[in-house]
Regions:
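Active-site-adjacent structural elements that line small-molecule/cofactor binding pockets in enzymes
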Residues: 1-317
Length: 317
């Protein structure tokens, strides 16, 4: 059974202030399994939001709601400071964060203004993941790499339980990276057949690295449009994707379902059958409340088991 989550209405996905808070409350009150947050420093026109700041805000306000970072531009940050951020979040909300990471090379300028070289993002990511995994045990580490040199680096207390790291990307290098360093893969713009093939290859890469793929969890980010007709559902989806990516919608359309919740669920079912354990929906509709209702209905259709009630108490109360 796949967990069905949706992106929080923050940052570049468009709601602010009281409207965003109300939408997050609707997500928490619904049968949606988890909330997702995205990450950009300065994308295209300068847009963005810090995924770990937003994750901390969500996790401390809603005591039982899990949060998936899907995904975080890890090569644009220093891995030791990220390890501290993750450890701090784990203290506040143990076991409720899933940490997805990716290169974020779609906007070369964003990478450059963060002081990174777009040509070396992959190697930088590999070193960052090695450091994150080593620091997650709470032991002192030394590291001598191309980008990072550490002597007796340590982060305590270590996250307990360990925060799963899901590696995103469509390239062969990303697939190898997921097997070598991740706890699963995060796909986007992929067919169900390709999804199944990639997960098998990740298992092979994990075994080649001396790791067991047992327990790996693979996820899918997917843009979806909801509305009373397919035409009505397509319009807000197309507008949102054009605005975010600054590109035409048509090349993405075959991977981006729209229509009724039933039509969206029918589109997603083959991914669940292909081994997807978490579907992260970027939901678009003409009315703010419609995306939450649409995703909740998709969840009911794909995973009909009811959820336990949640509390709205603040974590510090």
């Amino acid at each position: 059974m796949a967990a069905i989550g949706m992106f929080a209405p923050v940052g570049a996905f468009a709601l602010t202030g009281e409207t965003a808070g109300a939408a997050l409350s609707r997500i928490d009150e619904s049968d949606v399994d988890h909330v997702c947050v995205n990450d950009h420093v300065s994308f295209r026109v300068g847009a963005g939001s810090d995924a770990l700041v937003n994750a901390a805000a969500v996790l401390t306000h809603y005591r039982l709601l899990p949060c998936h970072v899907a995904l975080y531009l890890l090569p644009l940050r220093h891995p030791v400071t990220v390890a501290r951020q993750l450890a701090s979040i784990a203290e506040l909300a143990p076991g409720r964060l899933t940490f997805g990471v990716g290169l974020g090379g779609d906007d070369r300028h964003e990478v450059e203004i963060c002081g990174a070289d777009p040509r070396t993002l992959g190697r930088r990511m590999d070193e960052s993941l090695q450091i994150l995994r080593a620091l997650s045990d709470g032991e002192s580490i030394d590291f001598d790499g191309e980008f990072f040199t550490l002597h007796e680096a340590r982060i305590v207390p270590a996250p307990a339980p360990r925060i799963p790291i899901i590696v995103g990307g469509r390239s062969d290098a990303a697939v190898r990276r997921a097997g070598r360093f991740g706890d699963g893969w995060l796909g986007i713009w992929v067919s169900p057949g390709r999804f199944a093939t990639v997960t098998l290859r990740i298992a092979e890469h994990a075994q080649a690295a001396g790791r067991s793929p047992d327990g790996f969890a693979h996820a899918l980010n997917v843009w979806c449009g909801f509305g009373p007709t397919r035409t009505a559902a397509r319009a807000p989806l197309e507008a949102a994707m054009r605005g975010f990516y600054q590109m035409p919608f048509e090349p993405f359309e075959r991977y981006s379902p729209y229509g009724s919740p039933g039509e969206v669920a029918e589109f997603l079912q083959p991914y669940v059958e292909a081994g997807c354990s978490a579907v992260n929906i970027i939901a678009c509709a003409d009315r703010h409340e419609d995306p939450v209702a649409g995703v909740a209905e998709v969840r009911r259709l794909l995973a009909p088991q009811p959820k336990a009630a949640r509390t709205h108490e603040h974590v510090f109360s």
